[in-house]
């Protein structure tokens, strides 16, 4: 009796199906046997006899357990036993049947199929056929008499044997074909494996560039892989087809055998050799011939399989139970454990249903039915189902009208192979489709808390909304990740109400709102959005900077500092390495602000239905300011250049680039709103790209005009995207400056911050969520910490009022950047939530590593990359050795050389800032300090006082200066070396943004380097990888400072991958200027260069940095080098006799001439790392086709020219400038660059002791009374420009002179602007040396003359503009331009202009900070405020850090 499977619905279902089929098969076989025996033999009563072993032949096996030979009386009480075996690959079914009714019938011999196993031989050597024997128990004599019939049955079954031979041949052919196809498949897989390995080697190669890798992969590897995949698929299909053909032929063969052999019915099928062990030779039971049999009969439709089992194991008892295994008709697919039917008692019939009554059969059927269960709806709802569709058990009861797919399908119609709702526990692990509680939670039921999404839902028909959404779709609400194309996230609109908009961003479809908790944290979403990088090991770069962990060494270090009489850096200054950034200084305030905004959101968003926003949308506001209403804010550092001034008519006609629908409006806004005559390089390209909806990466030097790239598109309404521009800015002080500047231009700009009253924040937030602002400045901490801010942005996006996202100072995104901010990495939120909104990333400092990080972390999509030269020609770079008198040298220079001029002194820590500021105050200099440890209001007051010239010098950490709007900074001192070359460029770039000559002076000390190393190594917030990164960057700074030979400008620009010819420096750095005072010699470094190339070539595949290679070449035995066995290289230690600076110079030169090459790779942390490899010119060097020679200093000057004596008057010196000026980009090289101030008046600068530095207003002979105020201002500006040029030219002379052109001549030149030598001669008696020097002023005079003529035209334009403005106030038909025609950019609705004016006034009240105090009070509050020191004490400190008591 078959045991019914339990706790398994699928098994139970299959078992029922198999049982029904099996009973039919049994009926068919039994009837055929009955008919055959009844017709062939008479009934006799003979005792059963067991044949001898010799009769059966040597190939027999004791297999079937029969009735012992105890005579006819014993057999008369036995029931029929019929043995039949149904076989598949691993399962067999056996039945044994005997009948006392046919005990006298002799045996019937049926020849077996012999397609696989050859026939065994008789003892005589003759070949005989094996037969499957059906032998009822009979007398031995009858068996002996019929033995001849057994052997003679060969002729009677000749046709069957022939058919078997044909089947054998067909089956062998099919198997050979399958084997051949499988061999071909194996070879194809091997070829595919080789191609994949080759692909991996190309990807991991360090000797190939990225372009070369892509070319090889696309040209060689990918086509072959594609062809190989097609070939493998084809072979797999052929193998499957061949197997199916063989199976079908076996089935037809089996059917033909059964149908054509009435006299040769197969009565027994042997079990598989794997399932059965042969009996012993001493067995007295009936034996049957062990031959191969068909794997399955035609009844089951299985494949034919021939096996042979020879009796070798004779130790098993013949009384072993027979196993009858139920065949699973899908065993080829499901490797299920067999269901075993074990032979029961002797009275158990083989076919129980033939002997059962109807009642017994009904009882058996009831016992075998599937267990009853309630009807359950397993179907997942789709788009056509109603919203109230519910999965679960109550579908029929609660929703009788819903038609189920299961009702249309019968159990037999279901394919078990694809069944997904009845699985076992083992299958659950593989398919994860077992029904569990999460299936019932798939649909949000109505019993959820109705107030859970109050902020986002209105009282509308939810089901109708979702049905509408499912029909129309919302392309804006579905994000398809580029990393995983199958992951889609449906975002929600913060409001259910759809505001109509004509913009691209608006689609009138209601959004499906997800639960708030799911939006805040979704594990599946996080996993799908995260990038996966290989966990391969990358050898990290090594620095030769020694570890300073010894306390004794630190004590000796401090003792040396004290002996020198100056307070150097010490461990007391150790703090978190990046603490000076303004990181998360407002987190607590942001949390409080977020709570306030939540209240605002609840009031505003829930009341939108009652008080909908006005139907009008903000259009272009009417500008009331005229050209004459320029204020001193026009010198904003990023969007004005005096040298670019041309007439407006010329600008409007000069459009060489492509034109767009918004081009006219862009030019109009540029002139009328920003009061600018034209664009700087790359500005127009950036504006057009973002108005097209593209992502943009803008890389411009400081003062290059980055802000205009997003401020101008913010006021242009005709682009593809329009609305509110969100600007992510790192510093609150920077945001305040930007907002104040934009409000002065009547641009609706505001900022989110925790400052101000709750009412002011409420007003700003209401303007923001309604899309009434052009620009909104938000800090990255606000984006990551405030959920209300994110919801407001989501509402803007849903309403089609989100124009673009701007990331200012984007280098903060990169871990390689000098101002890394962790919250910046969260800004990828924008491209994931709003993928179709364009993004702009702007920065002034970005190496190749930083650029890769920015694009990767912000997830920019094919950004338009705009880059220009980083060369700041008006900056003078100088590096001096730091001594104990350095602070006094700085004080003397500020009081003499930089008298009445503002500047910055950068220090490395808060303590150093306070000490330096106190020392300068004691020397009579108006100075204050600025660092991140101060209160925000204190920092703001110091910054405002410095910008208003109430403070001359500000001592600050790196927390100060980012985006500072002060163009006339004349000097930047680094009292301590900067931490990175990026930071050095950024901080020095804050000088001379008006284009005038400025100085960048750095003081260098190895003790400062060692102290900063200690700060990095002891920073607990940095892991080992980041510590090495910072140490490597610090070593680059050290190499830059210690280099006294190469051009400073070339060294800085090479860091940004920009090639620069040092001849173009024109002695604008200390190394180029001092080159005349040192003795250099030329050395041939070809041989060391070859050794370096061989060294790099031998270890470049291990991803080594250039600093690591320098250490190996120098002979370092650091732990990394020893562990990597690089100390055994032939090139190790070859350069031990050379100085470290010389080795660094050689490596740097090899990279410059492309013998070596640096490349960047994204590491496991998601940041780019730079490594070195041989370059394209390495082969020329190794083959002797290239020689390398370099200049080395053999006698460096003992002391550099003192900065205090740089301006000694020397009238007889001729400037060392080429007599034939070289033109670069249209400018004379001797002249300063064209980045100059926008102010109409610059202060007078006096240099110590010089008589030329008068600060009183300029008066011209007998003409001042006849000139207007505007003309006088122009004269003063012209004089200052010429005077500044004279100072710059004097600085370039060797030695420098302080009176390159006398003041009296400069004043006359400012009045008449002579264009040639003859006009210059009319100035009066002029010495010959000044006539020779006049040629250096010609280009500047031509520029000034052009500007003066354009201002004369603007004077008349101003009168016309004023007239039309007055006329517009009295007319309601619009405003006319100066040409008399109506501007298409002005709206006819004057109410709109009034509303815009009200919005700007409201912003001013809520955003503008209070005015700073007067000069005296401001200075007094700064200089005398008692700050809390680093040790917690209050009071004044002298420079050495000692506290003085109050008097």
From Swiss-Prot:
Cofactor(s) in the UniProt record: Mg(2+)
Activity regulation information from UniProt: Helicase activity on G-quadruplex DNA is inhibited by ATP-gamma-S.
Positions of region (Disordered): 37-78, 243-264, 342-430, 552-572, 601-639, 1402-1447
Record field: compositional bias (Basic and acidic residues): 243-253, 363-386, 601-611
Reaction catalyzed: Couples ATP hydrolysis with the unwinding of duplex DNA by translocating in the 3'-5' direction; ATP + H2O = ADP + phosphate + H(+)
This protein's GO CC annotations: chromosome; cytoplasm; nucleolus; nucleus; RecQ family helicase-topoisomerase III complex
GO MF term set: 3'-5' DNA helicase activity; ATP binding; ATP hydrolysis activity; DNA binding; DNA helicase activity; DNA topoisomerase binding; four-way junction helicase activity
Occurrences of domain Helicase ATP-binding (ranges): 687-864
Location in or out of the cell: Nucleus, Nucleolus
UniProt short sequence motif DEAH box, positions renumbered to this chain: 808-811
Keyword Endoplasmic reticulum: no
One of the GO BP terms on file: DNA repair
Annotated keywords: ATP-binding, DNA-binding, Helicase, Hydrolase, Isomerase, Nucleotide-binding, Nucleus
Compositional bias annotation for Basic residues: 1425-1447
Enzyme Commission no: 5.6.2.4
Biased composition (Low complexity): 1412-1424
Residues engaged in binding ATP: 714-721
Domain of life: Eukaryota
Helicase C-terminal domain mapped to chain residues: 886-1035
Domain HRDC: 1272-1351
Function: ATP-dependent 3'-5' DNA helicase able to unwind duplex DNA or DNA:RNA heteroduplex. Unwinds G-quadruplex DNA; unwinding occurs in the 3'-5' direction, requires a 3' single-stranded end of at least 7 nucleotides. Helicase activity is higher on G-quadruplex substrates than on duplex DNA substrates. Assayed with a catalytic fragment (residues 400-1268). Telomeres and rDNA are notably G-rich; formation of G-quadruplex DNA would block DNA replication and transcription.
Subunit and partners: Heterodimer with TOP3. Forms a complex with TOP3 and RMI1. Forms a ternary complex with a MLH1-MLH3 heterodimer (MutLbeta) during meiosis. Interacts with TOP2.
Listed name of the protein: ATP-dependent helicase SGS1
């Amino acid at each position: 009796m078959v045991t019914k499977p339990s706790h398994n619905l699928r098994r139970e279902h299959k078992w029922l199906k198999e049982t029904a089929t099996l009973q039919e098969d049994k009926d068919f076989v039994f009837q055929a046997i009955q008919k055959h025996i009844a017709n062939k033999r008479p009934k006799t009563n003979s005792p059963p006899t067991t044949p001898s072993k010799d009769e059966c032949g040597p190939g027999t096996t004791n297999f079937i357990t029969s009735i012992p030979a105890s005579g006819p009386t014993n057999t008369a009480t036995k029931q029929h036993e019929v043995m039949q075996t149904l076989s598949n690959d691993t399962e067999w079914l056996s039945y044994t049947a005997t009948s006392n009714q046919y005990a006298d019938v002799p045996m019937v011999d049926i020849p077996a199929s012999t397609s696989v196993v050859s026939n065994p031989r008789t003892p005589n050597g003759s070949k005989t056929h094996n037969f499957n024997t059906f032998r009822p128990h009979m007398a031995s004599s009858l068996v002996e008499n019929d033995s001849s019939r057994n052997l003679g049955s060969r002729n009677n079954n000749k046709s069957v044997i022939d058919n078997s031979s044909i089947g054998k041949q067909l089956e062998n052919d099919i198997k050979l074909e399958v084997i051949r196809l499988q061999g071909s498949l194996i070879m194809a897989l091997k070829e595919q494996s080789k191609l994949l390995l080759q692909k991996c080697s190309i990807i991991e190669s360090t000797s190939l560039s990225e372009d070369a890798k892509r070319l090889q992969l696309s040209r060689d590897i990918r086509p072959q892989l594609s062809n190989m995949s097609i070939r493998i698929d084809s072979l797999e299909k052929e193998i499957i087809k061949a197997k199916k053909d063989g199976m079908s032929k076996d089935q037809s063969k089996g059917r033909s055998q059964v149908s054509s052999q009435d006299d040769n019915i197969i009565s027994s099928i042997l079990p598989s050799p794997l399932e059965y062990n042969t009996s012993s030779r001493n067995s007295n039971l009936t034996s049957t011939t062990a031959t191969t049999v068909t794997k399955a009969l035609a009844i089951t439709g299985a494949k034919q399989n021939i096996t042979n089992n020879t009796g070798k194991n004779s130790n098993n008892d013949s009384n072993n139970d027979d196993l009858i295994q139920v065949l699973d008709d899908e065993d080829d697919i499901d490797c299920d454990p067999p269901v075993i039917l074990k032979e029961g008692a002797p009275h158990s019939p083989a076919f129980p249903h033939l002997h059962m009554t109807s009642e017994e059969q009904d009882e058996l059927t009831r016992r075998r039915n599937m267990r009853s269960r309630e009807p359950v709806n397993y179907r997942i709802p789709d788009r056509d189902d109603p919203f109230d569709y519910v999965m679960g058990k109550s579908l029929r009861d609660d929703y009788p009208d819903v038609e189920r797919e299961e009702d249309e399908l019968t159990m037999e119609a279901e394919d078990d192979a694809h069944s997904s709702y009845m699985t076992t526990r083992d299958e659950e692990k593989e398919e994860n489709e077992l029904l569990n509680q999460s299936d019932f939670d798939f649909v949000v039921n109505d019993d959820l808390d109705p107030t859970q999404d109050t902020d986002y839902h209105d009282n509308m028909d939810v089901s109708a909304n979702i049905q509408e959404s499912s029909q129309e779709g919302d392309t804006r609400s579905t994000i398809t990740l580029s990393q995983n194309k199958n992951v889609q996230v449906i975002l929600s609109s913060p409001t259910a109400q759809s505001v109509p908009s004509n913009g691209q961003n608006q689609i009138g479809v209601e959004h499906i709102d997800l639960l708030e908790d799911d939006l805040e944290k979704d594990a599946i979403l996080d996993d799908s959005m995260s990038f996966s990088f290989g966990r391969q090991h990358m050898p990290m770069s090594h620095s030769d900077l020694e570890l300073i962990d010894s306390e004794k060494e630190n004590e000796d270090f401090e003792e040396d500092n004290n002996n020198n009489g100056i307070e150097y850096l010490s461990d007391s200054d150790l703090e978190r390495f990046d603490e000076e950034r303004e990181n998360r200084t407002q987190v607590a305030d942001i949390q409080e602000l977020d709570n306030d905004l939540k209240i605002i959101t609840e009031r505003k968003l829930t009341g939108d239905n009652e008080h909908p926003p006005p139907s009008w949308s903000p259009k272009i506001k009417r500008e009331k300011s005229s050209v004459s209403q320029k204020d001193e804010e026009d010198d904003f550092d990023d969007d004005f250049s005096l040298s670019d001034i041309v007439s407006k008519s010329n600008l409007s006609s000069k459009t060489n680039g492509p034109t767009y629908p918004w081009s006219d409006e862009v030019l109009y806004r540029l002139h009328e709103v920003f009061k600018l005559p034209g664009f700087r390089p790359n500005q127009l390209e950036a504006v057009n790209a973002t108005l097209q909806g593209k992502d943009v990466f803008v890389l411009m030097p400081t003062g290059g005009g980055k802000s205009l790239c997003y401020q101008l598109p913010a006021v242009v309404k005709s682009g593809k995207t329009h609305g509110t521009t969100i600007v992510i800015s790192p510093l609150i002080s920077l945001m305040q400056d930007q907002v104040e500047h934009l409000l002065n231009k009547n641009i609706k700009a505001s900022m989110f911050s925790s400052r101000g009253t709750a009412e002011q924040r409420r007003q700003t937030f209401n303007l923001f969520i309604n899309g009434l602002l052009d620009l909104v400045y938000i800090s990255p901490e606000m984006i990551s910490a405030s959920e209300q801010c994110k919801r407001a942005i989501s509402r803007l996006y849903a309403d089609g009022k989100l124009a673009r996202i701007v990331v200012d100072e984007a280098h903060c995104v990169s871990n390689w950047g000098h101002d890394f901010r962790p919250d910046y990495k969260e800004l990828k939120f924008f491209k994931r939530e709003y993928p179709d909104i364009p993004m702009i990333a702007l920065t002034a400092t970005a190496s190749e590593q930083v650029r890769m990080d920015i694009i990767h972390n912000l997830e920019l999509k094919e950004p338009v990359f705009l880059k220009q030269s980083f060369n700041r020609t008006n900056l003078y770079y100088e590096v001096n050795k730091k001594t104990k008198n350095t602070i006094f040298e700085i004080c003397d220079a500020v009081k003499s050389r930089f008298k009445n001029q503002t500047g910055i002194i950068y220090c490395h820590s808060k303590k150093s800032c306070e000490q330096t500021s106190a020392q300068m105050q004691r020397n009579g200099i108006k100075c204050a300090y600025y660092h991140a440890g101060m209160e925000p209001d204190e920092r703001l007051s110091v910054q405002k006082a410095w910008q208003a010239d109430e403070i001359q010098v500000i001592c600050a950490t790196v927390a100060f200066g980012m985006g500072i709007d002060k163009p006339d900074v004349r000097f930047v001192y680094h009292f301590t070396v900067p931490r990175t070359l990026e930071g050095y460029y950024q901080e020095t770039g804050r000088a001379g943004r008006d284009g005038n000559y400025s100085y960048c002076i750095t003081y260098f000390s190895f003790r400062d380097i060692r102290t900063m190393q200690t700060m990095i190594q002891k920073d607990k917030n940095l892991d080992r990888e980041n510590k090495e990164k910072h140490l490597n960057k610090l070593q680059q700074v050290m190499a830059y400072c210690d280099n006294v030979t190469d051009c400073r400008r070339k060294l800085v620009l090479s860091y940004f991958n920009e090639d620069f010819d040092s001849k173009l420096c024109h002695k604008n750095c200390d190394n180029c200027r001092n080159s005349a005072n040192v003795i250099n010699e030329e050395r041939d470094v070809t041989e060391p260069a070859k050794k370096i190339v061989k060294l790099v070539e031998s270890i470049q595949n291990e991803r080594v940095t250039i600093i690591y290679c320098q250490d190996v070449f120098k002979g370092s035995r650091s732990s990394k080098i020893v562990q990597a066995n690089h100390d055994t290289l032939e090139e190790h230690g070859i350069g031990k006799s050379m100085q470290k600076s010389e080795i660094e110079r050689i490596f740097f030169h090899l990279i410059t001439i492309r013998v070596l090459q640096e490349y960047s790779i994204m590491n496991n942390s998601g940041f780019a790392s730079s490594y070195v490899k041989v370059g394209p010119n390495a082969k020329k060097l190794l083959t002797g086709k290239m020689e390398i020679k370099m200049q080395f200093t053999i006698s460096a000057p003992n002391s550099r020219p003192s900065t205090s004596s740089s301006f000694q008057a020397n009238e007889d010196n001729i400037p060392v400038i080429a007599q034939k000026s070289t033109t670069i980009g249209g400018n004379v090289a001797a002249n300063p660059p064209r980045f100059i101030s926008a102010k109409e008046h610059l202060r007078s600068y006096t240099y110590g002791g010089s008589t030329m530095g008068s600060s009183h207003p300029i008066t011209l002979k007998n003409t001042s009374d006849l000139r207007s105020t505007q003309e006088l201002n122009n004269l003063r500006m012209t004089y200052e420009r010429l005077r500044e040029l004279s100072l710059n030219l004097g600085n370039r002379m060797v030695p420098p002179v302080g009176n390159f052109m006398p003041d009296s001549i400069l004043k006359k030149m400012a009045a008449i602007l002579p264009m040639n030598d003859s006009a210059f001669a009319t100035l009066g008696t002029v010495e010959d040396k000044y006539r020779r020097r006049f040629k250096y002023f010609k280009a500047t005079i031509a520029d000034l003359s052009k500007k003066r003529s354009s201002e004369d035209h603007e004077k008349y334009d101003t009168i016309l503009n004023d007239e039309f403005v007055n006329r517009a106030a009295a007319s309601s038909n619009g405003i006319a331009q100066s040409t008399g025609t109506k501007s298409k950019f002005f709206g006819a609705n004057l109410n709109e202009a009034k509303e815009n004016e009200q919005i700007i006034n409201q912003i001013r009240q809520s955003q503008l900070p209070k005015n700073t105090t007067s000069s005296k009070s401001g200075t007094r509050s700064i200089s005398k405020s008692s700050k809390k020191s680093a040790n917690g004490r209050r009071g004044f400190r002298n420079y050495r850090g000692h506290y003085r008591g109050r008097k």
